[in-house]
UniProtKB/Swiss-Prot annotation:
It comes from the Bacteria. GO terms for biological process: cytoplasmic translational termination; translation. This is Ribosome-recycling factor. It comes from Salmonella typhimurium (strain LT2 / SGSC1412 / ATCC 700720). Responsible for the release of ribosomes from messenger RNA at the termination of protein biosynthesis. May increase the efficiency of translation by recycling ribosomes from one round of translation to another.
Length: 185
């Protein structure tokens, strides 16, 4: 019983950490990364379709992404979708490819992005703590039903706290890495 609760809590905490890492990977840094365009959706014959299903995105150099659209007639629609996104990018057609130069980040924009990333980190920490609370509540319910002893309850809470501390350390480490990446010139 208790081991199931602990395993469930551990899996859920790990999912919180992974969701945070995925979220901050979408925040633009000074370097080009294909994942930057993951959230872009293009109207493909009346159907909203993710860009990665319509084209391949590669890094041409440290500040330029190259998009090779599979259906050449979709080039203008892809450009329009990139411009409509809130990424502040201006794509340009070059024959069969679309190039997306990444403008350098200003100091002010770097600070704004750092604030956003810190907010995401706090949300991840809160999510991890909520998982801890749920696990502890389930264990307390077992104690109340006299299915476990007080020693088991205390031991379980200590283990859940250790898992919580480990998950929060992972969030903090990912946050520190992203902040360092954002502040590089």
């Amino acid at each position: 019983m208790i081991s199931d609760i602990r395993k469930d809590a551990e899996v859920r905490m790990e999912k919180c950490v992974e969701a945070f890492k995925t979220q901050i990977s979408k925040v633009r840094t000074g370097r080009a990364s294909p994942s930057l365009l993951d959230g872009i959706v293009v109207e493909y014959y009346g159907t909203p379709t993710p860009l990665r299903q319509l084209a391949s995105v590669t890094v041409e150099d440290s500040r330029t992404l190259k998009i090779n659209v599979f259906d050449r007639s979709m080039g203008p629609a892809v450009e329009k979708a990139i411009m409509a996104s809130d990424l502040g990018l201006n794509p340009s057609s070059a024959g069969t490819d679309i190039r997306v130069p990444l403008p350098p980040l200003t100091e002010e924009r770097r600070k704004d992005l750092t604030k956003i990333v810190r907010g995401e980190a706090e949300q991840a920490r809160v999510a991890v703590r909520n998982v801890r609370r749920d696990a502890n509540d389930k264990v307390k319910a077992l104690l109340k039903d006299k299915a476990i002893s007080e020693d088991d309850d205390r031991r379980s809470q200590e283990e859940v706290q250790k898992m919580t501390d480990a998950a929060i350390k992972k969030v903090d480490a990912a946050l520190a890495d992203k902040e360092a990446e954002l502040m590089q010139f």
